[in-house]
Amino acid sequence: PLGGKRAAPDLDVRKCLPCGPGGKGRCFGPNICCAEELGCFVGTAEALRCQEENYLPSPCQSGQKACGSGGRCAVFGLCCSPDGC
């Protein structure tokens, strides 16, 4: 319906940066990179690119569904927030 939660387009939320081997993953936080086939990398070299998110002006979102307390579904049923999985 007009004026409902879905009335305004989500122009301010973009996909988070790609990361990990071959750029197959997505950043879930400044130190977290999750890739469908590989799982999640936390605080490793694969997640280093995710620190760039701190310097970008617009917010981003990874994962399809919300889970836990402010998290998003990552891989293999794992729920990740910017602080951890």
UniProtKB/Swiss-Prot annotation:
Keyword rRNA-binding: no
Modified residues (Glycine amide): 3
UniProt keyword annotations, A-Z: Amidation, Cleavage on pair of basic residues, Disulfide bond, Hormone
Family annotation (InterPro entries): Neurhyp_horm (IPR000981), Neurhyp_horm_dom_sf (IPR036387)
Entry's Gene Ontology cellular component terms: extracellular space; secretory granule
MF GO annotations: neurohypophyseal hormone activity; oxytocin receptor binding; V1A vasopressin receptor binding
SS bonds (residue pairs): 16-60, 19-33, 27-50, 34-40, 67-79, 80-85
Family: Belongs to the vasopressin/oxytocin family.
Summary of the function given for this chain in its UniProt record: Neurophysin 1 specifically binds oxytocin. Oxytocin causes contraction of the smooth muscle of the uterus and of the mammary gland. Acts by binding to oxytocin receptor (OXTR).
Subunit and partners: Interacts with oxytocin receptor (Ki=1.5 nM). Interacts with vasopressin V1aR/AVPR1A (Ki=37 nM), V1bR/AVPR1B (Ki=222 nM), and V2R/AVPR2 receptors (Ki=823 nM).
The protein, known as: Oxytocin-neurophysin 1
Source organism (scientific name): Papio hamadryas
